[in-house]
Amino acid sequence: MPFIYINTALAYSMSLLGLLIYRSHLMSSLLCLEGMMLSLFIMMTTMTLNMHLMLMYMLPIILLVFAACEAAVGLALLILISNLYGLDYVQNLNLLQC
């Protein structure tokens, strides 16, 4: 297994571990999710380039589009919660129900 695959798998697992540890704060959770998306992007890009799969060249770009949408929605929720409550705890998401 090449060295870059080991590094990206380690980065993904560290981001997942950070997400599990710091799940009470929304900002920390969003940063860990972005780290997971970045490591997935690097892994998918290297795999498509190494295997020469022509049909999968657009897949990492689609992943980046979904990651950008996820980040935008997460930051909008973070700003909304911070303005309403002054804290970024995930428990405040339950208070936003209509």
Swiss-Prot record:
Membrane-crossing segments per the record: 1-21, 29-49, 61-81
Catalysed reaction(s)?
A: a ubiquinone + NADH + 5 H(+)(in) = a ubiquinol + NAD(+) + 4 H(+)(out)
Enumerate the Gene Ontology biological process terms. ATP synthesis coupled electron transport
Q: What EC class is this?
A: translocase
The protein's location, in the record's own words, is: Mitochondrion inner membrane
Membrane topology annotation: Multi-pass membrane protein
Looking up InterPro entries in the UniProt record yields: NADH_UbQ_OxRdtase_chain4L/K, NUOK/Mnh_C1-like
Sorted keywords for this record are: Electron transport, Membrane, Mitochondrion, Mitochondrion inner membrane, NAD, Respiratory chain, Translocase, Transmembrane, Transmembrane helix, Transport, Ubiquinone
Instruction: Enumerate the Pfam families for this protein.
Output: Oxidored_q2
Show the coiled coil region(s).
Answer: none
Enzyme Commission number: 7.1.1.2
Cellular component per GO, a single term? respiratory chain complex I
PANTHER family per the UniProt record, alphabetical: NADH-UBIQUINONE OXIDOREDUCTASE CHAIN 4L (PTHR11434:SF0), NADH-UBIQUINONE OXIDOREDUCTASE SUBUNIT ND4L (PTHR11434)
The family note in this entry says: Belongs to the complex I subunit 4L family.
- What's the protein name? NADH-ubiquinone oxidoreductase chain 4L
